[in-house]
Amino acid sequence: TAWEGYEKIPSWIMEGYGTMASEAAEQLREAAINRPSHVFVQAGVGSLAGAVVGYFANLYPDNPPTFVVMEATNAACLYKGAVAADGEPRIVTGDMPTIMAGLCCGEPNTLGWDILRNHVTAFVACPDWVAARGMRILGAPEKGDPRVISGESGAVGAGLISTLMTDDSYAELRDLIGLDKTSNVLMFSTEGDTDPEHYRKVVWDGAYPAE
């Protein structure tokens, strides 16, 4: 992460993540999608999220996509900063149990936070079952869709989108971000089955069912 006085190396890391956003934009153009309506991106300290949001906010300055940032509930430092609504980052301390190990970070990158607080429409704190749902959906998609082997931190976007679109108890958030069946959503799977045994427990055995 970054903090005051330590920003150079974190900025290089964010530049690297920006390459991923650039490659995604190129793939969208090849698929004749001029602009995604929404960009869903997960966050730990916010380096990846800041790079992705910053890239697409600059790519579409006059009509940017709706940005949604997802965190693990027990490590949702960016969400807490957004709720505080004073522009200052917040730090989560103590135990942060979650299956989304890659998102288990309690101190935000100040460089990323500065981008995110100015461009993100919704910060969402996601419980583990949302990530597990995404893993199962991507691992066993509907006919015609490609299979994606995605780990816990990578699949949370698919789980959240599916939940928002199928569970009317989240209609307020769905309406807030303008998500509907006409949306073109860009999301990023940032890991595979880094723990194959746990992946099987979730995808095959149904661990962490929806609550």
Predicted regions and their residues:
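Glycine-rich phosphate/pyrophosphate-binding loop at beta-loop-alpha junctions
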Residues: W3-N118, L173-E211
